């Protein structure tokens, strides 16, 4: 997706939106009850949102910090979306992933359709159903995310960046589209240049932020993914820098690896730059949290560099004091950019 453009492969699934860590999962996220017309969720709407908040706070600390800067209704909606995305990811990347089949994902997609029809099947669904009644979310990004999980069922390698870009759109760019429907746009700020009376909707930039976050995840988690038999770095990039799969398996950190990582980090930063251009189109109450989330995630790339590109046995994370320093900077950017 050069210069913010959607690749032809994913344009066919683009609707009219990274944050998933590899830490231990709570048991709630592993439950996938069978459909039952008579089943009634026991949680109230408030209880359901509290479940979403707790999971987000425990397993996506950096992301959660950004949501606390949002108005209450928006932050709760984002927590509900996060939990659905997390549970979807769990199907192919969690402790019970070995039991997941294409039929499992078919069932999960039918369950999604039920949620959009206002029919929750468990406590966690209750919050998302309520969110759908409040915000104009499209089902297509959710479907596309499930399609991304289908890719993980069959693939552990990506030959080209175009292939990886499609995967990143499906599992993370979609999150940008889901979130932007909640965050909203500033109807008095900026128009599409080819349609002066129209409100500019930063869909491309929303996708770019999701892809940037996913590329950052991939670079941060290289060592963990290799241990699980997965290589997300495009094989054409490894070949370009004369770095083999065996080198990757052995955790070789030499000049070839550092050059490869510099190349990949530059690519991720390009997506972050694309995303930044869309923030000014968001509602004013969304700009500070989005700037904060972007800066926090982009900061992981700086830490990877500071660690001399050692992602094999050192996990890159932004320390809490630095996270707090980002807050006033993000606030200032939200006011003037």
Curated annotation (Swiss-Prot):
One MF term from GO for this chain? 15-cis-phytoene synthase activity
Q: What class of enzyme is it?
A: transferase
Instruction: State the superkingdom.
Output: Bacteria
Q: Where are the transmembrane segments?
A: none
Query: Which PROSITE patterns would you find in this protein's record?
Result: SQUALEN_PHYTOEN_SYN_1, SQUALEN_PHYTOEN_SYN_2
Pathway it works in: Carotenoid biosynthesis; phytoene biosynthesis
Q: How is the cofactor bound?
A: ATP is required for the transferase activity but it does not seem to be hydrolyzed during the reaction.
Q: In the Enzyme Commission scheme, what number(s) does this protein have?
A: 2.5.1.32
GO terms classed as biological process: carotenoid biosynthetic process
Asked if the Swiss-Prot or TrEMBL record annotates the protein with the keyword Metal-binding, the reply is yes
Per UniProt, the keywords (alphabetical) are: Carotenoid biosynthesis, Magnesium, Manganese, Metal-binding, Transferase
Q: Which cofactor does it need?
A: ATP; Mn(2+); Mg(2+)
Query: Which reaction equation describes what this protein catalyses?
Result: 2 (2E,6E,10E)-geranylgeranyl diphosphate = 15-cis-phytoene + 2 diphosphate
Q: Mind telling me which InterPro entries this protein's record contains?
A: Isoprenoid_synthase_dom_sf, PhytoSynCyanob, Squ/phyt_synthse, Squalene/phytoene_synthase_CS, Trans_IPPS_bact-type, Trans_IPPS_HH
Q: What family is this?
A: Belongs to the phytoene/squalene synthase family.
Its biological purpose is as follows: Involved in the biosynthesis of carotenoids. Catalyzes the condensation of two molecules of geranylgeranyl diphosphate (GGPP) to give prephytoene diphosphate (PPPP) and the subsequent rearrangement of the cyclopropylcarbinyl intermediate to yield 15-cis-phytoene.
| The name this protein goes by in its record | 15-cis-phytoene synthase
From which organism does this entry originate?
A: Synechocystis sp. (strain ATCC 27184 / PCC 6803 / Kazusa)
């Amino acid at each position: 997706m050069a210069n913010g453009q959607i690749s032809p492969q994913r344009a066919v699934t683009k609707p009219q939106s990274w944050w998933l860590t590899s830490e231990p999962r709570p048991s709630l996220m592993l439950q996938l009850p069978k459909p039952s017309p008579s089943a009634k969720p026991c949680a109230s709407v408030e209880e359901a949102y509290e479940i979403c908040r707790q999971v987000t706070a425990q397993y996506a600390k950096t992301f959660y910090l950004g949501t606390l800067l949002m108005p209450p209704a928006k932050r709760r909606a984002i927590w509900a979306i996060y939990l659905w995305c997390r549970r979807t990811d769990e199907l192919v990347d969690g402790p019970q992933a070995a039991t997941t089949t294409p039929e499992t994902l078919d069932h999960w997609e039918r369950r999604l359709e039920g949620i959009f029809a206002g029919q929750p099947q468990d406590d966690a669904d209750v919050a998302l159903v309520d969110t759908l009644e409040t915000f104009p979310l499209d089902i297509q990004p959710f479907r596309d995310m499930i399609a991304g999980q289908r890719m993980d069922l069959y693939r552990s390698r990506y030959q080209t960046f175009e292939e990886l870009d499609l995967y990143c759109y499906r599992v993370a760019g979609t999150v940008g589209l889901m979130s932007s429907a909640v965050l909203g746009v500033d109807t008095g700020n900026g128009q599409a240049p080819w349609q002066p009376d129209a409100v500019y909707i930063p869909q491309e930039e929303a996708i770019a932020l999701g892809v940037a976050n996913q590329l950052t995840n991939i670079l941060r988690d290289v060592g963990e993914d290799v241990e699980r038999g997965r290589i997300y770095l495009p094989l054409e990039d490894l070949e370009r820098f004369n770095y083999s799969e065996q080198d990757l398996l052995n955790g070789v950190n030499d000049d070839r690896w550092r050059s490869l990582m510099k190349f990949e980090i530059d690519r991720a930063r390009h997506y972050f730059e694309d995303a930044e251009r869309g923030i000014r189109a968001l509602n004013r109450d969304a700009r500070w949290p989005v700037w904060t989330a972007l800066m926090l995630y982009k900061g992981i790339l700086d830490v990877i560099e500071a660690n001399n590109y050692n992602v094999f046995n050192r996990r890159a994370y932004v320390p809490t004091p630095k996270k707090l320093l980002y807050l006033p900077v993000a606030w200032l950017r939200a006011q003037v950019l």
